[in-house]
């Protein structure tokens, strides 16, 4: 593909890309399933190096690669634990770089994906590192909005929950900064407010935002509500987690009382108790659509990066 900005490129942060790059990805995602029959990744191998537990992201990448005719090498579970205890990460990445045509890495340490990209010659895709970045999640989240509304621009967004430790929420907010939202409400307890660098990205690009604590105060304005769980595994003090757990709960009664009928609720999953099951069969629910579209977006991304 002429003018493909993804070909052979590392995917470390959503902010490494432009709005135009993402719009190209969206167009490719719209048609990628019709191309899958030609097996564009036939003969290609993707290493999935998951040093942190994952179900959805790993299966989504694995499905995406296999639908395109490629194959995967998986490091997870006991293999990842033994590597974490002994072998140097650089040695592991060097080994995978010799076996595979691309590497997807997920790691609990911030900066691990960038480090892997510096070591490897093949493209490295960040499947989530620490609390910092989860670019492919942001890509599929933005694509979901695009699919539902036909645009990412001009909408009012609410991002709810753990905005301090949650990498999916941070990446989504950073992704929104590449577009032109009407307004972004950042809804969280004071202890879990968005980090300064995330706010600075919004400010730098002139995206209007407001930090609030009560969902009910802004729910009626929202076109999209992006809900995240409290990140138990990233909050250092268990007592702090217990005090914050259950800070927000989105129920069908709440939505029917305050929200627009056209509101769509997104969630990167897994959820704990922040969205009641009553929402699942309502007109507001879009998180299962979001999960389904994730495979399509990752198919488009892997095809663009590995084949062009």
From Swiss-Prot:
L-aspartate binds at residues 85, 167, 229. Pfam families: OTCace, OTCace_N. Carbamoyl phosphate binds at residues 56-57, 106, 134, 137, 269-270. It catalyses: carbamoyl phosphate + L-aspartate = N-carbamoyl-L-aspartate + phosphate + H(+). Keywords: Pyrimidine biosynthesis, Transferase. Catalyzes the condensation of carbamoyl phosphate and aspartate to form carbamoyl aspartate and inorganic phosphate, the committed step in the de novo pyrimidine nucleotide biosynthesis pathway. Heterooligomer of catalytic and regulatory chains. NCBIfam families: asp_carb_tr, PRK00856.1. Belongs to the aspartate/ornithine carbamoyltransferase superfamily. ATCase family. This is Aspartate carbamoyltransferase catalytic subunit. It comes from Aeropyrum pernix (strain ATCC 700893 / DSM 11879 / JCM 9820 / NBRC 100138 / K1).
């Amino acid at each position: 593909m002429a003018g493909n900005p993804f070909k052979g490129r590392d995917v470390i942060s959503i902010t490494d890309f432009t709005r135009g790059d993402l719009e190209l990805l969206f167009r490719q995602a719209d048609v990628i399933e019709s191309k899958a029959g030609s097996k564009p990744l036939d003969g290609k191998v993707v290493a999935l190096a998951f040093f942190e537990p994952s179900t959805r992201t790993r299966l989504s990448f694995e499905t995406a690669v296999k639908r395109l005719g490629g194959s995967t090498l998986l490091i997870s579970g006991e293999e990842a634990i033994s590597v974490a205890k002994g072998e140097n990460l650089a040695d592991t990445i060097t080994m995978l770089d010799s076996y595979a045509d691309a590497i997807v890495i997920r790691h609990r340490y911030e900066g691990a994906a960038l480090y892997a990209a510096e070591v490897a010659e093949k493209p490295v895709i960040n499947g989530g590192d620490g609390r910092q970045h989860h670019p492919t999640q942001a890509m599929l989240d933005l694509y979901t909005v695009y699919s539902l509304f036909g645009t990412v621009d001009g909408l009012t967004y609410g991002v709810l929950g753990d905005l301090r430790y949650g990498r999916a929420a941070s990446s989504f907010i950073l992704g929104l900064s590449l577009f032109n939202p009407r307004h972004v409400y950042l809804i969280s307890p004071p202890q879990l407010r968005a980090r300064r660098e995330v706010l600075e990205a919004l400010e730098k690009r002139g995206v209007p935002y407001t930090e609030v604590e009560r969902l009910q105060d802004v729910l009626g304005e929202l076109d999209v509500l992006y809900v995240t769980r409290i990140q138990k595994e990233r909050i250092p003090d268990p007592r702090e987690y217990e005090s914050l757990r259950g800070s927000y709960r989105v129920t069908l009664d709440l939505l029917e009382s305050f929200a627009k009928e056209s509101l769509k609720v997104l969630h990167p999953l897994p959820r704990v108790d922040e969205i009641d099951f009553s929402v699942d069969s309502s007109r507001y629910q879009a998180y299962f659509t979001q999960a389904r579209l994730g495979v399509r977006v990752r198919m488009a991304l892997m095809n663009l990066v590995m084949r062009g």
